[in-house]
Amino acid sequence: MRTHYCGHLNKSLAGQTVELCGWVNRRRDLGGLIFIDMRDREGIVQVVVDPDMADAYEVANTLRNEFCIKLTGEVRVRPESQVNKDMATGEVEILAKGLEIINRSDVLPLDFNQKNSEEQRLKYRYLDLRRPEMSDRIKLRAKASSFVRRFLDDNGFLDIETPVLTKATPEGARDYLVPSRVHKGSFYALPQSPQLFKQLLMMSGFDRYYQIVKCFRDEDLRADRQPEFTQIDIETSFMTADQVRATTEKMVREMWQELLNVDLGEFPVMPFSEAIRRFGSDKPDLRNPLELVDVADLVKDVEFKVFSGPANDEKGRVAVIRVPGGAELTRKQIDGYAEFVGIYGAKGLAWMKVNDRAAGMEGIQSPVAKFLNEDVINGILDRTQAESGDIILFGADKANIVAEALGALRLKLGKDLDITKEGTWAPLWVVDFPMFEEDDEGNLHAMHHPFTSPLGVTAEELKANPAAANSNAYDMVLNGYEVGGGSVRIHNAEMQAAVFDILGINAEEQQLKFGFLLDALKFGTPPHAGLAFGLDRLVMLLCGTENIRDVIAFPKTTAAACLLTDAPSLANPAALEELAIAVTVAKEKDAE
């Protein structure tokens, strides 16, 4: 039906007759001539309908926005004075010879010329996707996927599919369960990742695997999470962690170069402990120069228990952030930040303004200065390299609370005060994660997943002191987002059983849940390692947006609902009966 896309027309086609299909973006009637901005997925071109073309003119008179049309016309170069430099096709226009309405449109429930509510956009997503901004994002996603496949194919990786109906495994989030009609009372789980299957593929001899695959997690949502998401899943045999990182870093660097013409440069490598110490996060945004500075040794002997208590607690921490120029913050703003860190468990936010460094104690303004002697204050000022006009913000609590609260505050200050260098890129690798993390009850949990190999210890050494072990894991971080995570995997049954033991999974449960894996590890398993990228998050960054819903064609809401199709919905009672499932809905107790 068409010979060209609207957005591909240029001066080289002058004099040629073209056939276009698309939508009416705008129609204008100017002194007899009718102008139509015609749009398709590749862009917009201006169409001129002259009254001399009687049939086309008659049709053009009836056109309204979003009518689907077919046009036959001649490409002609615009006069220099009429060139539209804001349009890719602005040097040409189409003189209409034939015009056909393929389909009419009702009045749209969305207004493409103003901001629509997200609820309306998701309910009428098929219309929202017509907007050039959204269309460009989906096209960039397609280019990113195509690039990944091409890169991995060229590097000897095999695209292999893994099952979608599988078995539940403990990977940190709740599973989406699918009832079996044949095996009544039993359930499949939709995969949170293809983790075990890709490891089994390594045991099968396919030493370089990849898959762009849908994964599912029934977890609380936020701007960069969805219940179903797309993963670039990669696994290799006989490659070290350094080699896996080098290969995947090359892929991301070349992707940014091809799609954005941006050179990310070589990625720095930072241990987990340094990331937490300096930035309060294992995914630090290095565009933000603010850092956490430890001062526990300076305040451990003060009488102010708010500081000295955590400073003398082996699980406590006292740290500060120096904010250049922050002395201009008002008390109301500081109180707002104190309320903000409270979200993360902090009990308050002590502060110290350095109004005049040269004036000594007279130049300090702080509600806690009276509890600190001059040597302590000078020590803090020297360590943070504070200058006149700065403010110092304190965190004193359990180490994890200080890291989380000040880490989040650091990001907020970066945005609020324009400290973060927007429009730049700051990638890095974070490595040497703890093997396990402890919950409030003192139980150990795998920090990544239970198939991650420990770093440099035997199974016996790991069991003797699991809390001290690091894992051979690595995360790729870009502008404060974890875009990919991976590890060297456990490749012998003894080590895998040891990890399960530490996690409190007894021998019987190991066989029930992971017997197939433990058996497979007995048959000459090669050393293997891998990594998985979140495609949605990568594309979100490529597009310069902050919400992955902007780069998914048909996303869910933060309540995991599809407003377009009204999913999830109640099941047919007959289908439930066939599945031998009875549904009970828990009701909240009436307020007393």
Curated annotation (Swiss-Prot):
Pfam families: GAD, tRNA-synt_2, tRNA_anti-codon
Superkingdom, natural source: Bacteria
Region ranges (Aspartate): 195-198
One Gene Ontology term from the biological process aspect of the record: aspartyl-tRNA aminoacylation
EC annotation from Swiss-Prot or TrEMBL: 6.1.1.12
Family: Belongs to the class-II aminoacyl-tRNA synthetase family. Type 1 subfamily.
Protein name: Aspartate--tRNA ligase
